[in-house]
Amino acid sequence: YFCTVGMSVYNIHKKPVSVPNVGKVTLTELLNSKKYGKIYIMLGINEVGYKFSNTIEKYSELIEFVKSKQSDAVIFIQANLHVTKSRSDSDKVVNNTAINGLNAELAKLADGKSKFYLDANILFDDKTGGLSSNKSEDSTHLYAKYYSEWGKWIIRQTASLIGEG
């Protein structure tokens, strides 16, 4: 996993990240280190306050960069998860209207051939369309106990889209 707190499409190339069983590497070094069959990208929640067109341009550039390093890899663009209705209703920046707008633009980056869009919000949303309040302590982040369910869902979706797990 190439991830760190605060990572965004604006800073993903800027500093090395500690990757389990690999060490501290930049994204370029990681992508050059071996051939990947599938690459899952989930960025955007830290960008919700930025102008969407700039964020989507940077996201598109990131996908093209990844494709240039891993031309045979299938890329899965993951939707940003919603926040709870209470957080959404009280936050002018990080709210479900903004998240849905960003996710809609991210979905357009998928081509259904080598780039696919995955939206796991159906797993965790309540009837209001926000993150279920019983699945988050801070109204923003999913409890870790749901990660396994999320991972299994991703495997099923991957199999459904490209015929393998």
Residue ranges and their predicted role:
Residues I45, A79-L81:
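Residue-level signal for short, function-critical loop segments
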